[in-house]
Amino acid sequence: MFDITTRDIKYLQGVGPQRATVLNKELNLFSLHDLLYYFPYKYVDRSRLYYIHEIDGNMPYIQLKGEILSFETLGEGRQRRLVGHFSDGTGIIDLVWFQGIKYLLEHYKTRTEYIVFGKPTVFNGRINVAHPDMDPSGELTLSTMGLQPYYNTTERMKRGFLNSHGLEKLMKNALALLQEPLAETLPPRLVEEHHLMSLDEAIRNIHFPKNPELLRKAQYRLKFEELFYVQLNILRYSKDRQRKYRGLRFERVGEIFNTFYSQNLPFELTGAQKRVIKEIRKDMGSGRQMNRLLQGDVGSGKTLVALMSMLIALDNGYQACMMAPTEILAAQHYETIRKFLFGMDVRVELLMGSVKGKKREKILKDLLTGDVQILIGTHAVLEDTVGFSSLGMVIIDEQHRFGVAQRAKLWSKNVCPPHVLVMTATPIPRTLAMTLYGDLDVSVIDELPPGRKPIQTIHQFDNRRASLYASIRKQIEEGRQIYIVYPLIKESEKMDIKNLEEGYELICAEFPDCQVSKVHGKMKPAEKDAEMQRFVSGETQIMVATTVIEVGVNVPNASVMVIENAERFGLSQLHQLRGRVGRGADQSYWILVTTYKLTEETRKRLEIMVQTNDGFEIAEADLKLRGPGDLEGTQQSGVAFDLKIADIARDGQLLQYVRDVANRIVDEDPAGTRPENAILWQQLQALRKTNINWAAIS
């Protein structure tokens, strides 16, 4: 039977080829199915009619019934506008349009009764409504007298009269074509067991809800299904992998681990570190491949946990590899691990793109013989020329900078897949971790080593620069180092914000006795590394930089970081930057400098940073403020797999619930052969063919 929802959107009444092209390009809508799954972002209650004598300019919305007494065109050029004088018998207001004047004069008539809806404002002492929604009063429908849906649109769509009201009309036309109920996408037993509305009812009520309760049920049904299929896909992938790859069994904790623990451990492990090592040991001895995500703030001791995990692999006769996203971070890990293992008979090597010639050949040869026990490196370890004698443990630092394909490439360097521990200093809220890293078990180091002084965070306005520089000078005199971070490299014509080039000149002039490093993303890697090394070694006292320093610089002597135009940064990025200070024994200060012009959301962000150092608290707040986003901060909202209705920040409880439901199904039907579940696997296949980036979540 033909599924009408697959019909091309251009054949829908009110669309046509021209509008179809706009919908294709602007909203990625190609079929009736795409249109029906383009959900409203809000609803406005239009059940009440007001009288003109009741209204004022502060009301959020008004709805009136009356007539247009007359039209007049005012102004010239861009100021040209159409004004309709509208009355309901109790008073007169102005309806104002700045676009489509010819069209409006052809379609709207004087002395004809209309329902008018919009936001009132006051101009020249008179109440007016700009670009109101208007319907003939004889067409009293659910949308004009109930909950009205509002759809996100673009400027290009509005120019073609495809505003929210226009999309609403297209939705009505699409639903009118559905002579049969929409085919179910969940098995009947799931719909019954979880008291879900049918798909057909849900789609109709999400666009045109008859009442708030039916809207709530429609939203619940569609959120349930969306999150359920995300979790089903992740869990099926994860269970398949566990069945196919049995994994190495590391039951022995031997001489290397015990010697390190008794003689080389630099300080007492925190309770959180002990708990995580116990979880890792349990995984390694289970006979299945470990795939674990280790979360912990900067300075929480993740590297030490990673090293102790690698030593377990060594005790069981296997090699270990640690991969970092940058050469500086890889070199830092190499130096840290060598210091930890000082005096022990463990060979550690560093392999990066910059390691060439005979030294590289020697490392590659000794990896194949097993003489190199621990390899630290960058993407260079993924090259086909790099092989191992017996790779048993892989540590990946800063997971979101490596793709799933790269992770899998490391597995392929062994006959039996090695255990994998993924480390990140980017705190990820539990609900988001469950969705983005559903195939990984999660461990959290949620306490810092004793003796660390909490970083003092201060927000100040940029008119207090003299006192700021005096504080910096005092810190430098006491032998400390300073970071100053800018949002831009060069001056922008469009934005009046501080930039690194001007900032560098200013700082050099302000602190003539100091050596100043300059680091930004457009420098050549060798030049950038050299400047960073000057700061790390203490040769320079001040580093002027962009956010390139958020990962990979460990300078315990740096006690102050100043963030210029802090209002330009997101919470996650700010938290990563703060992790660059507070690494030594001295009190550290983190200073957020802003202008007075701050939005309400920006004020909230800055307040959160001043009030807490807890990365997980900040991550939860970030998720609520701006959506899941891209973990590197380049995409400001939304997630890789483009959730249409569910909200990970607000639907965490439902996410956990559907995960349990999906888990039960995968456990009961691991091979996917039960007839009653056929619809699930068919739907998964269909979803994989859409624009959902399933690879990103599995």
Language-model segments: residues:
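Upstream accessory/linker segments immediately N-terminal to the RecA-like ATPase cores of bacterial MutS
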Residues: L74-N264
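OB-fold nucleic-acid-binding modules
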Residues: Y38-S70
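Short, surface-exposed secondary-structure boundary micro-motifs
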Residues: E67, K119-P120, N233, A566, ...
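N-terminal cationic and glycine-rich segments that engage phosphates or anionic surfaces
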Residues: N128-E139, M393, K409-L410, V422, ...
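N-terminal pre-Walker A segment at the start of P-loop NTPase domains
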Residues: F267-I277
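Inter-lobe coupling/hinge segments of SF2-like helicase ATPases
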Residues: R275-K278, S286-E607
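Accessory helical-bundle/CTD segments and flexible terminal tails appended to RecA-like ATPase motors
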Residues: D513, M532-I542, I549-P556, M561-E564, ...
